[in-house]
Amino acid sequence: MELPYTEPLTVREAGPRIVPEPPRRGEPGGEPCGLCSGGATKAVWGNEHFTLHPPVGGSMPGHVWLASREHVDSFCDLSPEAAQAFGPLVARIERAILAEGDVGRVHVSRWGDGGAHFHVWFMPRPLGMLEAKNFMLPLWEDVLPNVSDEELREAAERIAARL
């Protein structure tokens, strides 16, 4: 794995800690939740617990995100029914992304720092793109040239059709 930058890079010091942290979207005092207010990209698939969405802007067709229908923050906040449905659904989404072809691995990530509505990201690592292994994939996804939002949505719709 390699950074998508050339030398020389310098390590900078971390800034001061900000406590309490500022509110995120969907938290009291923060901006409205994008999902609950209808500001998120239109879902390509959904069931009683989750919806699947394409990203806006991105370089890797097949990159999708899964959100809970209920406004909760984390895995531990999901209803028992949604938590039970989550694992099998993740496996189905991974298989659907792998079926796109030319995919080495599917990375599943949850950061949660931007918004307080539970969502996870599925990122396909292109087959043979070994410099993007592990935690490097999001960095490479960010610096590679974007494809059109239409191409991202079409890939997401193909993935949804396999679910």
Regions found by a protein language model. Give the residues of each.
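Histidine- and/or cysteine-centered catalytic micro-motif in compact active-site loops
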Residues: 55-57, 69-71, 111
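A long amphipathic alpha-helix within ATP-dependent nucleotide-binding catalytic cores
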Residues: 79-104
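Short histidine-centered catalytic/ligand-binding loop motif
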Residues: 64-87, 140-148
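A short glycine-rich, hydrophobically flanked beta-strand micro-motif that places a catalytic Asp/Glu
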Residues: 101-114
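Short beta-strand or tight-loop elements
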Residues: 48-50, 104, 116
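Active-site microenvironments that recognize anionic phosphate/pyrophosphate groups
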Residues: 1-66
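C-terminal helix-cap and adjacent tail motif
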Residues: 1-19, 126-163
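A short beta-strand motif that forms the metal-chelation/ATP-contact edge
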Residues: 118-125
